[in-house]
Design a protein with these regions (language model features):
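N-terminal substrate-binding region of glycoside hydrolase catalytic domains
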Residues: 30-131, 256-259, 289-290
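Conserved, mostly hydrophobic/aromatic
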Residues: 152, 218-220, 288
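Alpha-helical scaffolding within the catalytic cores
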Residues: 52-63, 87-98, 134-139, 196-212, ...
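Substrate-binding cleft of extracellular glycoside hydrolase catalytic domains
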Residues: 82-196, 311
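Bacterial N-terminal signal peptides
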Residues: 11-21
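Substrate-binding cleft of secreted/luminal carbohydrate-active enzymes
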Residues: 44-53, 256-350
Length: 354
């Protein structure tokens, strides 16, 4: 066809470069993790998790053998729902955890503080004022019923305009929720999880206005979606700040947005290899959760604008599947296991820290 230049040498060179990039990402060593002594912090390990619904979690975990199951089970609940809805959520999660025995998986809970769907209906001020105390009590009952530790991302993506939280009332709401859970002696670790690039990376001084304080936060967290986020200086600055505050970092949500898995090696080079590089070279990161979704389907189901995010289901591409499963078999990763007891450090419950 006119205007199309055939250049086998160039094509071969580009392919070779891709192969070298993939090999480099997979062969680099993990730097030792920094130890902070936080609640539920593993020693020199990275906890693996997945979600973010029961069927997608099952599809993901079936890719791994019994010794390498994801340890964190992602689940979400809105604190501003009716009490009965919060109770029903707790019962459903308990059912799923029982079904997944003997793996002893640990819930990673996204606790939403809004009254709607990404429409700026933040209820943080009402929570801080005590108007949702019955829901907080019902939520605490649910966490207690799980009889295992949980990670809790209170008001996740707190700086996002779609939530419309206000710094002072968000902090007050965080304190109110955390105090109830701690006073009941529940084995949880709170995760202060930022939206990061999705919210335009607020300047540090603005982001920290949402910070409840070191005594009220156990982990920091950030969500990572698009391929250009891995090398952003703002991400490095966030990780550096977490280290200064002596907090381990959880990647609370991750998915190859706009990349997906269906392009095989290209998908791997664009998103999965950079993610592994980030995990290998950033010793503050001690947990990561992957969203194993076909985003168009869930956009239509739930009514969110995710229709062009792509198919992130690992099982849908052999190249991505095999490389991902192999990469996560590295001993640094902490899995759930069907043939041995895998546990997180004990939580020392000492009441509410002031």
């Amino acid at each position: 066809m006119k205007g199309k230049i055939q250049c086998p040498a160039l094509t071969g060179m580009l392919l070779a470069m891709l192969i070298v990039a993939v090999h480099s990402a997979s062969s680099a060593e993990y730097v030792p993790r920094v130890e902070f002594g936080a609640r539920l912090e593993p020693h020199n390990r990275i906890i693996l998790g997945a979600g973010q619904d029961a069927a997608s979690f099952d599809s993901y975990r079936r890719l791994f053998d019994d010794r390498h199951q994801p340890l964190l089970y992602m689940t979400y609940v809105g604190l501003c729902n009716p009490v009965a809805t919060v109770v029903a959520w707790g019962a459903q999660v308990q059912h799923e955890l029982t079904r997944l025995a003997p793996y002893r998986m640990v819930p990673q809970i996204g606790l939403n503080l809004t009254g709607g769907k990404d429409d700026g209906s933040g209820e943080d001020a009402a929570i801080a004022a005590g108007r949702y105390d019955m829901q907080i009590a019902a939520f605490a009952d649910a966490v207690s019923s799980f009889k295992r530790p949980v990670f809790l991302r209170i008001g996740y993506e707190f700086e996002g305009s779609w939530n419309n939280y206000h710094p002072s009332s968000f902090v007050q709401a965080w304190h109110r929720i955390t105090k109830v859970l701690r006073d009941r002696g529940l084995p949880f670790a709170s995760v202060w999880c930022a939206a990061g690039a999705a919210a335009g990376w607020l300047p540090p001084e603005q982001l920290m206005k949402f910070y409840p304080g070191d005594d009220w936060v156990d982990w920091w967290g950030v969500d990572i979606f698009s391929e250009d986020e891995f090398t952003r200086p703002q991400l490095k600055a966030f990780l550096d700040a977490a280290r200064l505050h002596r907090k381990p970092v959880m990647i609370g949500e991750s998915t190859p947005r706009y990349v997906g898995v269906l392009s095989g090696t290209q998908s791997w080079v664009r998103w999965f290899a950079p993610m592994l590089r980030l995990l290998k070279h950033c010793p503050e990161i001690k947990a990561i959760c992957y969203i194993n979704w076909e985003w168009k389907e869930w956009s239509e189901r739930l009514g969110y604008p995710w229709q062009d995010w792509g198919d992130a289901r690992i099982q849908c591409n052999e190249t991505v599947r095999d490389r991902w499963v192999k990469a996560l078999a590295d001993p640094i990763y902490l899995h759930a296991s069907g043939d041995e007891s895998v546990s997180l450090p004990e939580v020392q419950v000492v009441g509410t820290r002031r």
